[in-house]
């Protein structure tokens, strides 16, 4: 989840998931300060974790930045890996447009098994110049048509939440997880819908409302506790944070770099390093830069992710290793009184070391006897810390911009049982 911000659709998802599964506890794995679309969260991860706890989540875990800022496949792999590593998660419920878990499982099985016909179609679509996500979508459509699936089923692959659901299941297959997956129908506006649609407006629309300071409409779109904490963060100068706040810095940074620098960064291929190098010098605003780099095969989300990978100097080897070995720790952002009980069980069953107090993360690694890649552990945590330090520089209030928030802020503890 991203909870950027936590809106009425998220509350509907949480309530429906509880009714469907009847869990003893609820655990959410949440992006930190940067999200899958290559943008900063509108308020920081600690405030968003607090909202999630108030809304009924028992434990909030952080999805390491290296996964939170990848495409749907990398995002899902990181999230499922973290949940599986807790040793206590039995069921995962996600929202989807189709609400058809059987369909999503069939698609995931194809991606896992990689049949020859599908691989042939994928190669052909990539040669046409499509981005990988689109090439894969069209290859799957051709494969399903060949197998006699009806057109309505095939068109489901156009929907972003169905795609992400497929990736969750695919990731579980890859790591051999026994987690059971369920889906509920997504309600409200499409994610990319930028218009206010009442109580169930999209996260994109809500962020636009925040940007425009249309507070009554924001209030209508969020649960009361979510709105209250959002306004607290804004009034105290810790938000909102938007990509445009970072634009001048990012463009200046790109102008300082040569093409060889971009070639070392994860995700650069197909001439993108040249486009970044040239467009940074030919444009005067970050939005114009994005438009300049954009081409048929490159989505805006991919370009924004590459921009973040560049400024954080995330190299290809680090991401490849992370995607091969998965997250190397479980970071606790917050928990309730009830959640403290499941944390105790997690400490006995977890497959990865649990980091609660970031000041002690080195000691956590020293004491663990779990199979962890120590270098990767440090590299993943280092990226989380650096990106938090970067993010806080864009708080509106200068006095709030001090770094090392990962060390100065302890996990949120909500004393009232939910």
From Swiss-Prot:
Enzyme nomenclature, EC number: 6.3.4.-
Gene3D superfamilies (alphabetical): HUPs (3.40.50.620)
Keyword RNA-binding: yes
Location of the protein in the cell: Cytoplasm
Biological process, per Gene Ontology: tRNA modification
GO MF annotation terms: ATP binding; ligase activity, forming carbon-nitrogen bonds; tRNA binding
Ligand binding (ATP): 95, 161, 186
Stretches assigned to coiled coil: none
One GO cellular component, as annotated: cytoplasm
EC class name: ligase
Pfam name, any one: HIGH_NTase1
Catalytic activity from the UniProt record: cytidine(34) in elongator tRNA(Met) + acetate + ATP = N(4)-acetylcytidine(34) in elongator tRNA(Met) + AMP + diphosphate
UniProt cross-references to InterPro entries, sorted A to Z: Rossmann-like_a/b/a_fold (IPR014729), tRNA(Met)_cyd_acetate_ligase (IPR008513)
Keywords: ATP-binding, Cytoplasm, Ligase, Nucleotide-binding, RNA-binding, tRNA processing, tRNA-binding
Superkingdom as given in the UniProt entry: Bacteria
Xref: NCBIfam families: PRK13670.1
Similarity comment text for this entry: Belongs to the TmcAL family.
Function description: Catalyzes the formation of N(4)-acetylcytidine (ac(4)C) at the wobble position of elongator tRNA(Met), using acetate and ATP as substrates. First activates an acetate ion to form acetyladenylate (Ac-AMP) and then transfers the acetyl group to tRNA to form ac(4)C34.
Name of protein: tRNA(Met) cytidine acetate ligase
Gene: tmcAL
């Amino acid at each position: 989840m991203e909870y950027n911000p936590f809106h009425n659709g998220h509350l509907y998802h949480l309530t429906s998931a509880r009714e469907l599964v009847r869990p003893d506890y609820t655990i959410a794995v949440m992006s930190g300060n940067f999200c899958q679309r290559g943008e900063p969260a509108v308020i920081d991860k600690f405030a968003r974790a607090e909202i999630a706890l108030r809304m009924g989540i028992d434990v909030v875990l952080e999805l390491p930045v290296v996964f939170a800022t990848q495409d749907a496949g990398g995002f899902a792999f990181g999230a499922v890996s973290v949940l599986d590593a807790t040793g206590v998660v039995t069921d995962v419920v996600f929202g989807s447009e189709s609400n058809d878990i059987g369909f999503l499982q069939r698609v995931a099985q194809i991606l896992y098994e990689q049949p020859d016909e599908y691989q042939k179609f994928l190669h052909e679509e990539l040669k046409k110049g499509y981005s990988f996500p689109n090439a894969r979508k069209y290859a799957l459509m051709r494969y399903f048509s060949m197998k006699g699936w009806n057109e309505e089923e095939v068109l489901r692959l156009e929907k972003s939440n169905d795609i992400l659901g497929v990736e969750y299941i695919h990731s579980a297959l890859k790591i051999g997880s026994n987690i059971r997956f369920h889906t509920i129908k997504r309600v409200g506006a499409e994610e990319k819908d930028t218009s206010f649609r009442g109580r169930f407006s999209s996260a994109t629309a809500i962020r636009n409302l925040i940007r425009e300071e249309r507070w009554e409409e924001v209030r209508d779109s969020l649960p009361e506790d979510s709105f209250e904490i959002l306004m607290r963060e804004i009034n105290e100068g810790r938000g909102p944070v938007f990509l445009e706040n970072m634009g001048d810095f990012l463009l200046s940074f790109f102008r300082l770099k040569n093409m060889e620098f971009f070639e070392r960064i994860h995700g650069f291929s197909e001439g993108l390093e040249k486009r970044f190098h040239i467009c940074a010098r030919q444009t005067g605003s970050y939005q114009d830069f994005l438009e300049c780099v954009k081409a048929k095969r490159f989505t805006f989300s991919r370009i924004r992710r590459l921009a973040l990978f560049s400024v954080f100097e995330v190299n290809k080897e680090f991401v490849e290793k992370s995607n091969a070995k998965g997250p190397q720790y479980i970071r606790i952002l917050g928990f309730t009184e009830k959640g403290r009980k499941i944390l105790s069980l997690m400490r006995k069953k977890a497959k990865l070391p649990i980091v609660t107090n970031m000041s002690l993360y080195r000691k956590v690694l020293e004491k663990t006897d779990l199979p962890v890649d120590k270098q990767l552990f440090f590299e993943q945590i280092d990226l989380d810390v650096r990106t938090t330090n970067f993010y806080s520089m864009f708080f509106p209030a200068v006095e709030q911009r001090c770094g090392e928030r990962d060390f100065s802020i302890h996990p949120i503890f909500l004393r009232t049982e939910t």
